[in-house]
A protein has these predicted regions:
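C-terminal-most transmembrane helix of multi-pass membrane proteins
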Residues: 63, 71-72, 76-79, 256, ...
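Transmembrane alpha-helical segments that form core, pore/gating elements
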Residues: 56, 67-70, 155-157, 192-246, ...
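Helix-helix packing/entry segments at the starts of transmembrane helices
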Residues: 59-61, 145-151, 214-235, 268-304
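Hydrophobic transmembrane alpha-helices of multi-pass small-molecule transport proteins
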Residues: 70, 167-187, 207, 238, ...
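Juxtamembrane helix-entry segments on the extracytoplasmic side of multipass membrane proteins
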Residues: 24-29, 52-56, 60, 111-115, ...
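Hydrophobic/small/kink-forming positions within alpha-helical transmembrane segments
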Residues: 40, 44, 71, 123, ...
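Glycine-/small-residue-enriched transmembrane alpha-helix faces in small-molecule transporters
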Residues: 4, 9-61, 123-124, 128, ...
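Specific transmembrane alpha-helical segments of multi-pass solute transporters/efflux pumps
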Residues: 42-43, 77-89, 96-149, 184, ...
Length: 338
């Protein structure tokens, strides 16, 4: 009877743990969906902002705004984390030894190094990707740019294979549906690789590496701090060509304050931070699929804000993409022990 009760309790705890894990995955997926919405609407801000400032200036200023906003919120988040940690420690009756303290101190130094490296690498990739995208849009249509950029949903699983990640068959099916959906959604003319197309294709590869790098570093470091370092790095890198080629002035920047604030506060500070935090508890392939919905949301934002209407073909593309997202959420079957 005692063994039976212990078995029941253990099974109950396992069920609770699995439920919490599934709940975290669902929350992460919803965060990534919100990220896609924010980024989709940001295309409107980018379009309007480019009427006043150059692409490098826009990217530099928006990233510095994102850095500043996160710096304001980091102390508040630290306070919340300390309160949570204090609650956990209060419920733990085990004493902390000197060895544990020394180990924690050593680990803290290592974590800071990993945080800085991760933030800088992510910032470099973000600067390259966003710059290629912003400049590429000048030489190609928005439809082509949206389709080619979203090709990272195909590139990510391929890159994952090289680092030993297994990709489920259902994920590949979802990728295929997403590619077809993106084609119907974004393409308004025959596909041909011109100067702008090549630049945006490079952007797609850079975003793919960015997703993989975030997937590597995010479980090891504080996501908000890494995001802050990422934006600061990106702002500096984009600022160099801005000063050399665009001669930005304060009047032009202030004139574009509305799109810059949206892109800096929501698209950068909120969007990329949600991406980093959410990717701790979800698969990078599913993450890339969810974030690829920014193309759908950008068309919806153009329809509502700029009064650009969706054609039946584009609506079919939206439906296919949502079908792919739903399909990718089907859980993997687990073998049950006898």
């Amino acid at each position: 009877d005692i063994k039976r009760k212990e078995s029941v309790i253990i099974n109950f705890l396992i069920i609770i743990q699995e439920t919490n894990m599934n709940s975290k995955k669902m929350q992460s997926n919803l965060m990534l969906l919100l990220t896609a919405f924010i980024w989709g609407v940001a295309f409107v801000a980018q379009s309007v902002g480019m009427d006043y400032v150059g692409p490098f200036t826009f990217n530099s200023v928006r990233n510095f705004i994102g850095t500043f906003v996160l710096l304001l919120f980091i102390p508040l988040l630290d306070k919340v984390n300390r309160q949570s940690a204090a609650t956990v420690n209060a419920s733990n009756s085990d004493a902390v030894s000197a060895t544990d303290i020394a180990s924690t101190s050593s680990s803290s130094v290592s974590d800071k190094k990993t945080l800085i490296i991760g933030g800088i690498v992510c910032g470099i990739l973000l600067a390259i990707a966003s710059s290629f995208q912003q400049v590429g849009i000048i030489y190609t249509t928005v439809g082509k740019a949206g389709f080619i950029t979203a090709m990272y949903i195909v590139i990510v699983p391929i890159l994952g294979l090289f680092v030993g990640k297994k990709v489920r068959l259902i994920a590949w099916i979802s990728v295929g549906l997403s590619v077809i959906g993106l084609y119907l959604l974004c393409m308004t003319e025959s596909l041909s690789l011109g100067k702008g197309d090549i630049l945006v294709l490079i952007c797609a590869f850079c975003f793919s590496f960015h997703i993989m790098v975030v997937d590597y570093f995010s479980p090891k470091v504080d996501g908000v701090r890494m995001s802050c370092i990422q934006f600061f790095t990106c702002g500096i890198i984009c600022g160099i060509p801005a000063m050399l080629t665009e001669s930005p002035n304060l009047h032009a920047i202030l004139t574009a304050w509305q799109p810059l604030l949206y892109a800096g506060v929501l698209s950068c500070a909120v969007g990329y931070t949600l991406q980093i935090v959410a990717q701790k508890n979800t698969d990078p392939v599913i993450a890339s699929l969810l974030m690829s919905l920014e193309s759908a949301f950008s068309l919806l934002a153009g329809w509502i804000i700029l009064h650009q209407y969706l054609s039946p073909k584009e609506l079919c593309g939206c439906l296919l993409m949502f079908a792919a997202i739903m399909l990718s959420q089907i859980p993997e079957k687990k073998s049950v022990a006898a």
